[in-house]
Amino acid sequence: MAAASSPREENVYLAKLAEQAERYEEMVEFMEKVVAAADGGEELTIEERNLLSVAYKNVIGARRASWRIISSIEQKEESRGNEGHVSTIRDYRSKIESELSSICDGILKVLDSKLIGSASGGDSKVFYLKMKGDYYRYLAEFKTGDERKLAAENTLSAYKAAQDIANAELAPTHPIRLGLALNFSVFYYEILNSPDRACNLAKQAFDEAIAELDTLGEDSYKDSTLIMQLLRDNLTLWTSDMQDDTAEEVKEAPKPDDQ
């Protein structure tokens, strides 16, 4: 007879079910229970940390997409002078923004209070610090004034801390190091409006990975080459943007389903 599964294993399984059912809010709840069960400084497994990341990425991703759509409609209505509509849209946008803030605050609290401190390996430290940078970046996307400035500073600090560890401990072809470079470069481009820095960071990461491509193991080949392609796509987009200001969708690191 099979041994009864622990509450932690049960919640991991429920999180996988929720993912299959695309019930991502519940997936977040199950993974937060997994984090709570990993007490006494115990680390999450690679599978668990990836499930946590996927859960939050989907929950935040839906609202980020909503926010972009509503902001685009707001700009159109403003240009038409429809003040009544603009006022309604702003109220609705602020509702989405409060949801975004709540989600970001939730995962940032978990990262700071539990996950970053318990991480021992270089890959897990970089994974969680990158995640911290990502969620501060999502705050910087819609915050204004001093709140935006603070979110951007916190993003930069987390990404830099992750970069220092990645450069020292992870191979240039490691998918987590590449994903960090991708998202860090997006931050420079979109939040700090520094296309030169963005391009330099992305190009350096791509070139360093290309130079060591023959050392890439079969298990991470797919993940690493996918992120390298996204780095190259962004470089192509950004260099053409700097010439003709054409706005297209910037690529970020994919959800870590297979890492």
UniProtKB/Swiss-Prot annotation:
Disulfide bonds, paired cysteine numbers: none
Segments crossing the lipid bilayer: none
SMART domains in the cross-refs: 14_3_3
SUPFAM superfamilies: 14-3-3 protein (SSF48445)
Domain of life from the UniProt record: Eukaryota
Gene3D superfamilies: 14-3-3 domain
Similarity annotation: Belongs to the 14-3-3 family.
Protein's name according to its UniProt entry: 14-3-3-like protein
Organism: Helianthus annuus
